Structures are given as C-alpha cells and as structure tokens.
A protein has these predicted regions:
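Catalytic cores of enzymes that engage adenine nucleotides and/or redox cofactors via long glycine-rich
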Residues: 54-220
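Beta-rich, aromatic/charged-enriched effector core domains that present basic-aromatic interfaces
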Residues: 1-97
Length: 220
C-alpha cells in the first residue's frame, strides 16, 4: 500500500537533521525516475505548487463523477449500518465510492483522461458547485487497498508529455511525496506529536464547532 518501507524512511532520517517533505520528495522523484533527467527536475523546478492556486472561474465546466455501482456486499452492509448505527451522523444513501478493484481502475482512468490536465490549476480551489472538482478522490481507494500507488505511478509515467506539467508534477507530489512522507512522520513521531503542543494553543473550541453552527459554510 506504500512505495517505501518503514526501514526506507528510517534510513532517510539517519541522513537528515530535520525531516522535510521537500527533500524527501526530491529523493523519491529520483528513486522512482519521475519527471527527472540526470537527477535534475524536468521543467527546471522540483515543485510547481505556486502555479496551482488559481480560483475556479464559473465558465470552467466541471467533469462528471464516475458512477460506482452497488454490489451485493454494499447492500448487506448498508442494512447493517442503518440498523446498528441508526443514531450516527450520515446517510448510506449518499455512499458514492467504488468497492472493487475493477471500479477503482475505472475511476483512475477517468481521472487521468478527464481531470488530471486541470488538476494543478485548481488544486486548491473551493467551489459550491462541487466538493471534488478536479481531484481524483482515489485516497480512500488507495488506503483500503483497492488500488495501489504503484499502479498509479506506472500510469503517470506514460503521461509525461501529454498533460500540463504543473498538474502532473502536482499529483505525483501527492502520491509519492505527501502521502509517503506523512506516513513516515506518523510512524516515527506520533507519540511526540500526540503529547506535544507545537503552537502552544490553550483555548478550547466553542460548542458551535461541534454542533455545526459556526456560521462558516465549509465547517457547518
């Protein structure tokens, strides 16, 4: 489910005074031969993140989300959840994720052909028109083992000259950079992070944060 092992990350930590996503990502790009030539980044920069902060114009047509079909297993699980967790938040009728490898591959194909080219431009955009926009929504599928990062990386390698560089680099950074790096940080520093208070925050959230009445739409 991950491209690097726990030992790989420990070896990385041995050679660094302080773990930083930027140098970890650079190391991974070279290791997996992604957008590099002679160990230098294609396009002259390791990250095009500054290019990936555009607002989403109303004129941009949003891609449709691929349909995930209900299976005999999801039917049974929905009934179980509705009975066992009837007082919990959420609604099983809104379940929209694929639950098989075949469907997950369809979602990957759809992302690569319909979304990836504009993923970078609108990576940080927020819109009331949709909550996914040009993102892949593959994270839960990767985390549950329905599709592997290896498969995704192999497909991305074939698109080197076919999509916008800022989009391709931006998505590669999510898969081999942030995902792998944060896993390594959690495995090696989780106790310190759990017990620590880096920003020395001492104020408590008001009850509105828990009841969904802050007046801030994304939170409520």
């Amino acid at each position: 489910m991950f491209l690097n092992s726990r030992d790989d990350f420990k070896k990385y930590l041995e050679n660094k005074k302080k773990p930083l996503m930027a140098n970890y990502y650079k190391m991974s790009r070279i290791k997996f031969d992604l957008l590099v030539k002679d160990e230098k980044p294609v396009g002259g920069k390791w990250s095009f993140d500054k290019d990936n902060r555009k607002k989403l114009p109303q004129t941009v047509k949003l891609p449709k989300r691929p349909v995930a079909f209900e299976t005999k297993h999801t039917k049974v699980l929905k009934k179980f959840i509705n009975i066992t967790f009837e007082n919990h938040p959420g609604n099983t009728e809104n379940f929209w994720l694929p639950t098989t490898h075949k469907e997950s591959t369809v979602w990957l194909d759809d992302f690569l052909t319909e979304k990836l080219n504009l993923f970078g431009d609108y990576e940080d955009a927020v819109s009331q028109r949709d909550n996914i926009l040009f993102h892949s929504a593959l994270s839960p599928l990767i985390n549950s083992g329905l599709i592997t990062p290896e498969k995704i990386v192999d497909r991305l390698k074939k698109l080197r000259t076919k999509v916008n560089l800022n989009s391709l680099e931006g998505y590669i950074r999510q898969v081999i950079g942030w995902r792998e790096f944060m896993r390594g940080i959690y495995q090696n520093y989780s106790i310190e992070m759990e017990k620590g208070n880096f920003f020395n925050h001492k104020r408590k959230f008001k009850k509105e944060w828990y009841s969904g009445e802050t007046g801030i739409p994304p939170l409520d």
